[in-house]
Amino acid sequence: MVHSEFPLERLAQLASNPFQIGFARQVMRMLDPSHLIAYEAAQDGLLMRAQNEEALARPVALLREVYGDDLVLLPPQVRYMSLGNRPYEPIMLLRVRIAPRHREAVLGEFAERDVQLLEEHERPSVCVLRAEAPLRKLLGYGEALAKLTDGTGLHWIWLDRYIPMSDPPGGQAAEGKQAPSCGD
C-alpha cells in the first residue's frame, strides 16, 4: 500500500519471535483502525505508517504494555516519495501554542531545526506560532517542546505537501541509490 498521506513509518518487532510477519498479523487484530495511521504485516514485523509522531504514540504504548522488554521498536523514519529518479520529501505544517514567556526558547529551537516561521500571534496569556519544515527536521519536536515549556506547550503537526529534494537523504544520489519511497 502506498499511503502517501502517511509520511512517517516505524517498525515494531518481537525479539523472541523468529517469524515477524506472524507477530505483525497478531498485533494488527489488537490495534484499533484510525484515519491517522495504517498498519501492515511485513516480513520484518509490524510496519506502522502515520501522519505524525503523535499518531504513533497510542499503538506504541499499547505494544509496550503487552510485550514489555520483548518489543523492539526501530526509530521513526521519514517516508520519501520518488517520482522518476528524483526524491521528494514531506513538508509539514506546524502550529504551536505556548505561554509568551517561552516564545524566545521556542523560536530558538525553530532556528536550530531550520523551521520557517509563517505567522505569529501573541497575546498577554498565549502565543501561537505557525510554521513549516521538512518532516526530517521535526522528528522529536514534541519532546523538545515539552522540555522547553515545562510540559505546557501544545503543538500540532500535519502533512502539507511533498517537494523535490536537491540533496537526497543520506547522500544517496552520490552512491547511486534511489531514495526510499512511499510506494515501497
Where are the regions a protein language model picked out?
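Accessory interaction regions appended to the cores of large information-processing enzymes
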Residues: M1-D184
